[in-house]
């Protein structure tokens, strides 16, 4: 049974994870989950604020303090805003405005290695930008093709793909699985949930 510590009050974000139970003690957790909400404040990644960015610096700093408590043998999982937060905590930046992703529906993503295709929910207007990191510090596992008509934000260059699920493995920090979509919003029978659970099982320290 995997123990999950959800950062903040939105405990339902973890409901799609198989064979898990919630814990209110972070030190007991196998998985520490960061949830959705406001944009991450650009000051955390050294960027100027885009006109569309709305953030809560108090929340960011509180969650940064939680992230710094996570042990190397615990897996961080980020959902939507949480995925972007984990990108920033690992030294990445954010695209502060994109189009055709805040659709409140699903769109196709594909595996970088095998090209396998899945549907994922999409409710966001910002996006992870890990491409400023060293290649060994991250791996884009799943992506979408260039759905957006633009990629706006301070210091953003061309995106080879649109990152949807990214694994961060920066030395001295916990492994982080950053999922842009909302698995908790998907139908329980959705095959994408099985794929995501396989990723969880792969990276949780036994």
Residue ranges and their predicted role:
Residues 1-21:
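Short, charged N-terminal beta->alpha structural module
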Residues 9, 16-18, 27, 34, ...:
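Amide-donor transfer/coupling interface in amidating biosynthetic enzymes
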Residues 12, 85, 102-106:
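Short amphipathic alpha-helical face segments that pack within enzyme cores
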Residues 18-77, 90-91, 95:
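Flexible gly/pro-rich beta->alpha loop and the following alpha-helix that scaffold active-site loops
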Residues 39-41, 83, 128, 185:
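Glycine-rich nucleotide phosphate-binding loop and flanking beta-alpha elements
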Residues 78, 82, 87:
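Gly/Ala-rich beta-loop-alpha elbow adjacent to hydrolase catalytic centers
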Residues 84, 92, 126:
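Glycine-centered loop/turn positions within well-structured domains
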Residues 87, 95, 129:
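A short local structural element in Rossmann-fold oxidoreductases
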